[in-house]
């Protein structure tokens, strides 16, 4: 490549007629391997075309043409990053790899040349520095830890460098065969490439500087991803080893970060055609491995990311096998998550669709039938389909490819849930069990379990309750006897009363009177937090005992019985647990406990009526007018209370549950995505909770006081009966004091019930105008 200057010097000697004084006799010019080269790449074997320890002639002794020919040879060396006789590199022995890329060593020309040609040559020398920077970047980023995207970027840069080398070879060849080849000609040939080379250098420099800035702003301990550390600790690694390895691990720019930088640079250099052309080429080539990982994720549900450079992160410690023991949707929420720093700008608006497309396919893969179907599909069409998948971000079908994959994944999972997993049948079973729809089995269960349910919550035997529930579910003639899903129903005892639990959730969410839809979103987040605790009842109980006081006897934890603490649980296998998740089941449990509380108060009032009807003290007319009037007032109050409870039950079941259930099933029929299905399910439950007055602190308190008054009055029936016996059968004179006391007690119940009922009506009127218009129907029933 390098043109020898011996002929030039020999010609000079013959013309002058005397030998060159600076040269020793018998000296020979040849290529030698210099062991202590000053090149920044001296750690590698590199050829330095230097005169072997001899002193060179002063270039000022050469004529202008000889100097130009000499500099052409020197420049061809410098263009390849090598020193020559008269062109040398600055001393860069102490430079690091990073400094070599950011600030590559510059070449300089020894003095003695004509200033005109020296200036021309000096302008072209930066090509050699840029070449050194680019080759240093290629070598450093080709290591395996930098990932596929950096490897693809380096491959694109190598192709660019190869074109550059071909140009230098062509220039060298032209200089040999063309006697008129001059520095100006060389400059003309290399000028476009010089601009491109400089642009590539600037791009790579900015890339490294931006990454260095991000690395310096990250945490010193390297604990930015706590999930990775926890996974390593769960695998049995020592904590000191994990932390030290994390600290020593160098943070590198790779994957989506590289693509993001190149994309942002396209905008930055929008007005520079040369830079834009280079960036478009680099982005296209660098995005190929990323696009391949993207296609494998959205079309196959697989993550092939050994270098953690893809936008989807997989937590290997979370598997679907855990869902057999715990029906949480943690697998859905946490197993696959988005790496925010690895999302390219091209996917920012599509990142959720990318995430869910792969998730849906992954769920299908977890099911045996889905695996068979997907395997047969892949075996048949995989090769042909992969040829149609976009390979770069600038493909015209890039966005359409993601949307089609998203639609296909949705349809696959929806079909799986609706057909083989019998989702609709499970939803109807939940309605029977939790909303007490056609609940003949539940009446039988309450009759059999009432002795156990009357005990304080801490003394209740869950085993007995479960046995009695199983007997009721299997009783011939009931709707549940033929239900194939009754095996999923179990009994639990929540040590906290319903009202206190709801008040706690409301206090967390910060809902106040008159809150709007924004408050409802906070409610949704708050109730979701209960699902994330793991075992809500035990954790909440300990916190409640420290910070919450009961609002009433019905809501008091001191002596609550099984009627106030019992709840059902519904455990389903994966993938149904994605729809019937813990978040959804908690909502079902809240509604069930509310309906059970209403049914229990209704049963107490009905039992009170039975006692009044059968007991002679109530049934027979009294000769005392005051006693007879007191009994009529007591009957009337009990009737008012029973009517109130029955109106609440009718409103919540017939006008809230049934009305929204029909709408919900209609929305399910029209659902086109699994996300829509899950959202419609949660929206249905939240609407029911809201219209059942379970999401508002004021309505909760008033309901609690009303139900407490009704329950206490019903439980006081036996005391009233004994007092009537004493008054009717007293051998002595009529006990006016006892009668006055009975009238005072009854008047207190009447006042309490009337006052709280009026408060409930006023509150319903207010919230019907600000939040839920459905409450107007309840107001009309309560005031009718």
UniProtKB/Swiss-Prot annotation:
Transmembrane segments: none annotated. It is found in: Cytoplasm, Cytoskeleton, Microtubule organizing center, Spindle pole body. GO terms for cellular component: cell division site; cytosol; equatorial microtubule organizing center; gamma-tubulin complex; gamma-tubulin ring complex; gamma-tubulin small complex; half bridge of mitotic spindle pole body; inner plaque of mitotic spindle pole body. InterPro entries: GCP (IPR007259), GCP_C (IPR040457), GCP_C_sf (IPR042241), GCP_N (IPR041470). It comes from the Eukaryota. Part of the gamma-tubulin complex. Interacts with mcp6. Interacts with mto1. Interacts with mto2. This is Spindle pole body component alp4. The lineage of its organism: Eukaryota, Fungi, Dikarya, Ascomycota, Taphrinomycotina. The gene is alp4.
């Amino acid at each position: 490549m390098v043109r020898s200057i011996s002929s030039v010097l020999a010609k000079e000697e013959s013309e002058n007629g005397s030998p060159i004084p600076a040269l020793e006799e018998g000296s020979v010019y040849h290529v030698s391997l210099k062991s202590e080269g000053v090149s920044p790449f001296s750690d590698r074997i590199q050829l330095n075309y230097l005169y072997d320890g001899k002193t060179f002639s002063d270039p000022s002794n050469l004529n202008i043409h000889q100097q130009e020919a000499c500099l052409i040879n020197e420049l061809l060396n410098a263009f390849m990053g090598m020193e020559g006789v008269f062109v040398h590199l600055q001393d860069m022995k102490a430079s690091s790899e990073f400094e070599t890329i950011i600030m590559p060593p510059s070449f300089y020309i020894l003095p003695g040349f004509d200033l005109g040609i020296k200036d021309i040559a000096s302008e072209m020398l930066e090509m050699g520095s840029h070449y050194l920077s680019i080759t240093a970047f290629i070598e450093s980023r080709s290591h395996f830890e930098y990932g596929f995207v950096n490897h693809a970027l380096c491959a694109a840069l190598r192709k660019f460098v190869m074109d550059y080398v071909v140009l230098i070879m062509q220039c060298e060849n032209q200089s040999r065969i063309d006697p008129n080849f001059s520095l100006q000609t060389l400059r003309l040939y290399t000028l476009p490439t010089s601009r491109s080379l400089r642009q590539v250098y600037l791009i790579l420099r900015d890339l490294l500087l931006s990454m260095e800035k991000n690395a310096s702003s990250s945490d010193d301990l390297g604990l930015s991803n706590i999930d990775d550390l926890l996974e390593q600790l769960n695998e049995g690694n020592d904590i000191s080893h994990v932390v030290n390895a994390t600290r020593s691990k160098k943070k590198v720019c790779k994957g989506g970060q590289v693509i993001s930088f190149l994309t942002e640079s396209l905008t930055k250099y929008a007005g520079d055609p040369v830079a834009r052309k280079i960036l478009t080429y680099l982005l296209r080539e660098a995005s190929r491995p990323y696009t391949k990982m993207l296609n494998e994720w959205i079309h196959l549900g697989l993550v092939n990311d050994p270098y953690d450079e893809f936008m989807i992160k997989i937590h290997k410690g979370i598997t679907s096998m855990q869902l057999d023991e715990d029906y949480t949707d943690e697998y859905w929420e946490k197993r696959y998550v988005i790496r925010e720093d690895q999302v390219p700008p091209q996917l920012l608006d599509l990142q959720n669709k990318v995430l869910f497309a792969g998730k849906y396919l992954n769920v299908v893969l977890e099911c045996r039938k889905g695996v068979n179907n997907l395997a047969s599909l892949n075996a048949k069409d995989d090769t042909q389909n992969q040829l149609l998948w976009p390979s770069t971000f600038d493909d015209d079908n890039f966005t359409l490819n993601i949307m089609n994959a998203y639609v296909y994944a949705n349809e696959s999972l929806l079909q799986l849930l609706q057909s083989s997993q019998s989702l609709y049948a499970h939803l109807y079973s939940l309605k029977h069990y939790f909303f007490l729809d056609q609940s003949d089995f539940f009446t039988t269960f309450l009759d059999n379990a009432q002795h156990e349910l009357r005990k304080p919550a801490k003394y209740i035997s869950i085993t007995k309750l479960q046995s009695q529930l199983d007997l009721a579910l299997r009783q011939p003639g009931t709707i549940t006897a033929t239900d194939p899903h009754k095996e999923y129903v179990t009994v639990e005892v929540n040590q906290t009363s319903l009202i206190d639990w709801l008040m706690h959730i409301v206090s967390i969410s910060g809902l106040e009177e008159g809150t709007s839809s924004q408050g409802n979103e906070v409610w949704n987040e708050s109730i979701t937090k209960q699902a994330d605790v793991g075992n809500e009842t035990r954790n909440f109980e300990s916190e409640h005992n420290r910070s919450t006081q009961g609002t009433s006897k019905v809501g008091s934890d001191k002596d609550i019985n099984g009627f106030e603490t019992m709840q059902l649980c519904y455990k389903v296998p994966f993938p149904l647990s994605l729809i019937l998740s813990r978040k959804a089941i908690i909502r079902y449990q809240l509604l069930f406990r509310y309906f059970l509380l209403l049914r229990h108060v209704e049963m107490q009032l009905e039992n009170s009526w039975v006692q009044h009807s059968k007991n002679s003290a109530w049934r027979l007319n009294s000769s005392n007018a005051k006693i007879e009037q007191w009994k009529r007032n007591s009957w009337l109050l009990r009737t008012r209370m029973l009517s109130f409870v029955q109106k609440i039950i009718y409103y919540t079941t017939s006008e809230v549950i049934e009305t929204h259930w029909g709408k919900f099933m209609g929305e399910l029929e029209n659902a086109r995505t699994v996300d829509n299905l899950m959202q419609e399910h949660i929206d249905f439950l939240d609407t029911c909770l809201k219209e059942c007055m379970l999401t508002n602190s004021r309505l909760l308190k008033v309901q609690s006081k009303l139900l407490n008054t009704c329950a206490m009055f019903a439980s006081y029936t036996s005391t009233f009966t004994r007092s009537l016996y004493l008054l009717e059968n007293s051998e002595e004179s009529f006990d006016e004091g006892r009668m006055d006391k009975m009238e005072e007690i009854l008047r207190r119940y009447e006042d309490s019930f009337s006052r709280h009922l009026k408060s409930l009506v006023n509150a319903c009127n207010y919230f019907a105008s600000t939040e839920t218009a459905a409450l107007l129907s309840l107001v009309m029933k309560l005031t009718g």
